[in-house]
């Protein structure tokens, strides 16, 4: 990558879950499948393990939770069915409306990159099966805690300005504290984190708030850059 190439001076960093992909619907589909496949009690046990693991790791690990569930249920023949459901889930059907249009808009304005948290198997699978890997032309970064890896992001995608699009205000705040006026934070109000008014109120207001990811298309590069200086 040529560090002086003007097309890379503005880099758009897109989150995946509840930013491009409706992950709440994915979780709801998994919940229904678990109840149908292993029953209400075992499904509840899976989600208890899932929440415990998320607390330990700092990200959602659906397959990791299934692995731990397997330790307690080593002879459950339904586990393979649940695994197939997860691995073969049609993530492309859960892309938010106009999410790809928003990505294409960003690509016209600069460089578009996926910047996500997650495990090293299921999250890449989600990015691939949703079609996002191809739409972003392979420009995908997945970390354990992405807000702690901004130096690596800069090394891989040097830019004079960054645009961070994420449904979690906590992460937008952390990135803004690190990059300051070099980043414009964009908050799509999608998903349960974004719609939790009490949670959102704990943090400073992002530079730009949009009701849906497709609304990013309404902003010119000049408007996006200017918003960082408010």
Predicted feature descriptions by range:
Residues 64, 87-114, 147:
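Short, acidic loop-to-helix structural element flanking the phosphoryl-transfer center
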Residues 103-113, 117-141:
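Substrate-recognition/cap helix-loop segment adjacent to the acidic, metal-dependent catalytic center
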Residues 19, 26, 120-121, 170, ...:
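Conserved Rossmann-like nucleotide-cofactor binding loop
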Residues 13-15, 115, 164-165:
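Generic enzyme active-site microenvironment
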Residues 1-9, 128-164, 168-230:
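Asp-based, Mg2+/Mn2+-dependent phosphohydrolase catalytic module
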Residues 26, 37-40, 50-87:
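A metal-dependent, Asp-based hydrolase signature
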Residues 2-48, 72:
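Active-site neighborhood of HAD-like aspartate-dependent phosphohydrolases
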């Amino acid at each position: 990558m040529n560090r002086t190439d003007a097309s890379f001076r503005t880099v758009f960093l897109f989150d995946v879950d509840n930013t491009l992909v409706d992950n709440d619907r994915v979780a709801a589909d998994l919940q229904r499948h678990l109840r149908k496949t292993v029953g209400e009690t075992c499904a509840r046990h899976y989600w208890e393990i899932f929440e415990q693991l998320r607390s330990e790791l700092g990200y959602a690990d659906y397959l990791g939770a299934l692995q731990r569930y397997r330790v307690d249920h080593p002879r459950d023949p339904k586990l393979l069915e649940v695994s197939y459901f997860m691995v073969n889930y049609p993530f492309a059907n859960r892309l938010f409306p106009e999410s790809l249009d928003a990505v294409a808009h960003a690509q016209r304005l600069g460089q578009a990159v996926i910047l996500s948290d997650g495990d090293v198997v299921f999250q890449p699978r989600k990015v691939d099966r949703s079609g996002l890997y191809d739409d972003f032309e392979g420009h995908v970064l997945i970390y354990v805690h992405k807000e702690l890896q901004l130096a690596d992001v800069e090394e891989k995608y040097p830019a004079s300005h960054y645009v961070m699009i994420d449904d979690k205000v906590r992460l937008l705040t952390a990135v803004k504290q690190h990059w300051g006026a070099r980043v414009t934070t964009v908050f799509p109000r999608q998903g349960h984190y974004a719609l939790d008014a009490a949670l959102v109120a704990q943090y400073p207001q992002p530079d730009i708030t949009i009701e849906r990811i497709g609304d990013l298309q309404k902003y010119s590069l000049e408007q996006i850059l200017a918003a960082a200086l408010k």
